[in-house]
Every structure is written in structure tokens, then in C-alpha cells.
């Protein structure tokens, strides 16, 4: 996955402001659709909401490792470039390969497909689970542990994380 390119728009001199606004709107919505289809947005929103409601405070940054890697930086699994991965820098510091990320996504998708209710309003997602269900409790604990990874991935894909 490549980092999101910033959305830029220049209004040609000969174009009216209305026509320019329409072109910008179309370009913006195309970019929004690209983000939706290139990343498990629903899963991401769920994770961030779980964390937000738990009152968790986290801070993460991400360097993307995807074949084209700068010289001189080594990760826990050897020289950069050996293992295509995301290297996440948090207080604990951990390293997630693409295979591990795929497993995370599969598990999360399975959790979502089991049917916890998700209500969306604006940019807010609310998760409702059965607190008496050990599977739901375990899934929530697991989601919290993955929060730093998904927050960093969100930033990589142009989402605002707060």
C-alpha cells in the first residue's frame, strides 16, 4: 500500500469558480472512494471507536516498508527490505509484517461478520457487544491491543486520528 497523496487542486484561469468547485468536489469524492476501497475502513473505524470509548490515549507514527526502502534503518526482523512490513513506532515499539497484518484483518473481519451492532453517525462509529459473551470480551481486548497498529495505518491512509 502506498501513502495517500495529498489532495491538491488548482483552478485554471479560464474556468469559472462554480465549474472549479464541481471539479474539486468530484476529485475529493473519488479520493474518498479510493480510501474506502483500499483499506478496511469499517474495521478501522470500529477499532478507533473502541479505543476512544475506553479512554485510551495512544500515539503512533508509521514508516511504510513496501519494497522501496531507504538505507540505514534496521527493524527487529533484520535489515530493512528483508521483510516487507509496517514498522510501528509507539511507546512499546513493535513490528508488523504484511502477513501478520493480513491475519489481524481476517480476525477482525470474522469478528465483524459475527454480528456486533455498529451504528454510524457522521465520522463516529458505536460498537455494541454483549458484555456477558466471553468471545465478545476477548475480541474487544484483542482489538485494544491492535489499536496502535490501526491508528498508524489510519494516518498512513490519510485518516485523522485523535
Annotate each predicted stretch with a short phrase:
Residues 1-162:
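Acidic (Asp/Glu-rich) sequence patches and key acidic residues
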Amino acid at each position: 500500500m502506498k501513502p495517500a497523496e495529498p489532495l491538491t487542486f488548482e483552478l485554471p484561469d479560464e474556468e469559472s469558480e462554480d465549474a472549479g468547485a464541481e471539479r474539486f468536489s468530484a476529485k475529493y469524492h473519488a479520493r474518498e472512494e479510493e480510501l474506502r476501497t483500499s483499506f478496511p475502513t469499517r474495521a478501522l473505524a470500529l477499532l478507533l471507536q473502541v479505543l476512544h470509548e475506553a479512554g485510551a490515549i495512544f500515539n503512533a507514527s508509521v514508516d511504510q516498508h513496501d519494497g522501496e526502502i531507504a538505507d540505514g534503518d534496521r527493524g527487529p526482523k533484520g535489515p530493512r527490505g528483508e521483510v516487507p512490513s509496517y514498522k510501528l513506532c509507539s511507546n512499546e515499539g513493535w513490528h508488523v509484517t504484511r502477513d501478520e497484518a493480513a491475519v489481524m484483518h481476517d480476525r477482525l473481519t470474522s469478528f465483524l461478520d459475527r454480528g456486533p451492532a455498529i451504528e454510524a453517525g457522521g465520522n463516529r462509529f458505536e460498537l455494541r457487544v454483549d458484555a456477558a459473551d466471553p468471545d465478545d470480551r476477548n475480541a474487544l481486548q484483542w482489538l485494544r491491543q491492535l489499536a496502535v497498529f490501526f491508528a498508524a495505518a489510519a494516518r498512513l491512509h490519510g485518516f485523522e486520528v485523535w
